[in-house]
Amino acid sequence: MQFLRFAAAAAALLGQAAAFPPGFGFPPTQPERDGCVDSETPYIRSYFYVGGGYVDDGSGGHIFRDQMYVEKLLPVHGVSKGTPIVLIHGQAQTGSNFLNKPDGGRGWASHFVRQGYEVYIVDQTFRGRSAWMPGYGASKPSTYSAEIIQQRFTAVKEYNLWPQAVNHTQWPGTGMMGDEVFDAFYSSNVQFINNATYQQKTVQDAGALLLDKIGKPVVLLGHSQGGIMPIIIADARPELTKALILLEPTGPPFQEAIFSNKSSRAYGLTDIPVTYSPEVTDPTTDLVQQTYPAKGENFVQCVLQAEEPAPRQLVNLVDKPILLVTSEASYHAPYDHCTVEFLQQAGCSKTEHLELGEAGIHGNGHMFFMEKNSYQIQKVLRDWIQAL
């Protein structure tokens, strides 16, 4: 009897709740202070896996490998935006990058949910909750030392390894070991498989299945090593891709820069085949390369397709809006324009380059979505998406 009374009371309360304004039952939202708040946006969370399959483990049993973890977040008061957003992290990271920031501030996933979007966050294959089966694709996992993170991401001004590093001001705290925010960030870094071809192929396969499951065109947003994943997923599922946002994607085309100058990415932006017209069967001969002069001081030369023969076209991407975002102080600042030029040369005429410094957003490094002014940047992306 007591249970029935409780159930009736709960039902009545739930019936009343439908008439209450949005936010009822949750703590009031604090002033955003440019996005830095102490609590995340309430959401409905579920998770699932896509891709992968069973393989023989060599001893009479089977294991499951190459699967990708996906976390789905929905606004508690319902989705009000028609385009889902898929968030893809970079090397040595997991999907936690887009949850709350290392300083405790509200992350981009929370902002997108609050703005009414259906959000999907992945852990790339072999990363985080997407388990790697030892021996497949690499003999052992790789890691980034704390020193590398300091030098390239969080305390770049102290090392000054590229000209734009002097502009870095937005990382909260010192960006060095022992600082509370740095320690929170570095403790979230994970091992990774240093095999770009295997990584890209498995993410492409799993990502295509993710888009099939979502069932309608999405915005693919990727960062750094994960920044080229929107390209390869969109190439596999162009009809389910509405737009691509590339946050300082791996680059520049055909070569490394800043920390090395070795040849890389045989297909221009990727290590695996993507769809060109005319078809590329051997990238070493079919993609004729040409070096173009640097656009100015403190920038690198670009290796792009040659002017003759006519540059091959990325036919599955030519009609897609693409936004490439570069921060003012990152090691990408000297070369991201090469990636933009490569895409435009390959027929992607809707490619735009958002250089944050030129847009009046100053002081950011490579992990700008975690930095003090991250909400200011997210609002620019929100406006771009809404204008599609």
Residues covered by each model-derived region:
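Catalytic active-site module of serine/aspartate enzymes centered on a nucleophile-bearing elbow/loop
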Residues: 359-388
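Short beta-strand/loop motif that positions the catalytic acidic residue
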Residues: 318, 324-326
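N-terminal cap/lid segment of alpha/beta-hydrolase-fold proteins
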Residues: 23-80
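Short, surface-exposed "cap/lid" segments of acyl-processing enzymes
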Residues: 77-163, 167
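Conserved alpha/beta-hydrolase "acid-adjacent" motif
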Residues: 229, 331-338
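Fungal secretory targeting signals
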Residues: 1-21
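Gly/Ala-rich beta-loop-alpha elbow adjacent to hydrolase catalytic centers
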Residues: 221-230
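Conserved acidic catalytic loop of the alpha/beta-hydrolase fold
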Residues: 163, 170-172, 176-219
